[in-house]
Swiss-Prot record:
Gene designation per UniProt: CDC2A
Binding positions for ATP per the UniProt entry: I10, G11, E12, G13, T14, Y15, G16, V17, V18, K33
Domain Protein kinase: 4-287
Protein name as annotated: Cell division control protein 2 homolog A
Reported function: Plays a key role in the control of the eukaryotic cell cycle.
Entry-annotated residues carrying Phosphothreonine: T14, T161
Activity regulation note: Phosphorylation at Thr-14 or Tyr-15 inactivates the enzyme, while phosphorylation at Thr-161 activates it.
Residue numbers annotated as active site: D127
SUPFAM superfamilies listed in its UniProt record: Protein kinase-like (PK-like) (SSF56112)
Length: 294
């Protein structure tokens, strides 16, 4: 750990404290994540070390690069490139952002590019949200942070500071207790983020798992065996769920053009087997006029 000098604490993530730090060897500024593990007395599980080591191989312009993994005194520190702006901060500080469809499109394209890369390496994110989409102020390049950490460490219900981990971007199959979910969970999250960029407010801001599900069903319709074969067999599906009809997406996201609505509709299919893949989303007509993307 001698190589890294902490400069200041910059936040508290899902897994532990995040510091702005300096690499004493290269003098570059980095982000240092101290991972707080549940079973701290036992040290770091070897499975977590293996998972994290694989992530060092992931290199792509839309992924925050994991530069180093330091295992010291039963603690795990992850060293990432440093970016100080995230999509949530950007949306909060620039409400006019949603009025710029080109920028929304450019950010969405980069999110999908990063995800398609990860999925092609069989890595899921599972916890995508505006807070872990980082933006380079100079270039408007967008990079996904915390990819693969969920598999290494699990997703806690609360962070180590007892903040509730957000459910707003969680896919319906996870909320319904499916154990066999896959890459479509990330595409669902991206759909929610897409709508939020356009509407300037979260699409499904639930405050509990059941509230989250019902907020989804009120817009997308309550699923049944016809619309989602197998849904009634999921562990947390209840036949007593209210049966809401689906709304028109155009009424829910009124500022989005027809091709944008078509893409959003394909990302927000309740049945994960019918959801568009990240790779196919990049080929969608919505992006035909995309031009240069950082």
């Amino acid at each position: 750990m001698e190589q890294y000098e902490k400069v200041e604490k910059i936040g508290e993530g899902t897994y532990g404290v995040v510091y702005k730090a300096r690499d004493r060897v290269t003098n570059e500024t980095i982000a240092l994540k101290k991972i707080r593990l549940e079973q701290e007395d036992e040290g770091v599980p070897s499975t977590a070390i293996r998972e994290i080591s694989l992530l060092k191989e992931m290199q792509h312009g839309n992924i925050v690069r994991l530069q180093d993994v330091v295992h010291s005194e039963k603690r795990l520190y992850l060293v990432f490139e440093y970016l100080d702006l995230d999509l949530k901060k950007h949306m909060d500080s620039c409400p006019e952002f949603s009025q710029d469809p080109r920028l929304v499109k450019m950010f969405l394209y980069q999110i999908l590019r990063g995800i398609a890369y990860c999925h092609s390496h069989r890595v899921l994110h599972r916890d995508l949200k505006p807070q872990n989409l980082l933006i380079d102020r100079r270039t408007n390049a967008l990079k996904l942070a915390d990819f693969g950490l969920a598999r290494a460490f699990g997703i806690p219900v609360r962070t180590f500071t007892h903040e509730v981990v957000t459910l707003w971007y969680r896919a319906p199959e996870i909320l319904l207790g499916s154990r066999h979910y896959s890459t479509p969970v990330d595409v669902w999250s991206v759909g929610c983020i897409f709508a939020e960029m356009v509407n300037q407010r979260p699409l499904f801001p639930g405050d509990s798992e059941i509230d989250e599900l019902f907020k989804i069903f009120r817009v997308m319709g309550t699923p049944n065996e016809e619309t989602w074969p197998g849904v009634t067999s999921l562990p947390d599906f209840k036949s007593a769920f209210p049966k809401w009809p689906a709304k028109e997406l155009a009424a829910v996201v009124p500022n989005l053009d027809a091709s944008g609505l078509d893409l959003l509709d394909k990302m927000l299919r309740l049945d994960p087997s019918k959801r568009i893949t990240a790779r196919n989303a990049l080929q969608h007509e919505y992006f035909k006029d995309i031009g240069f993307v950082p």
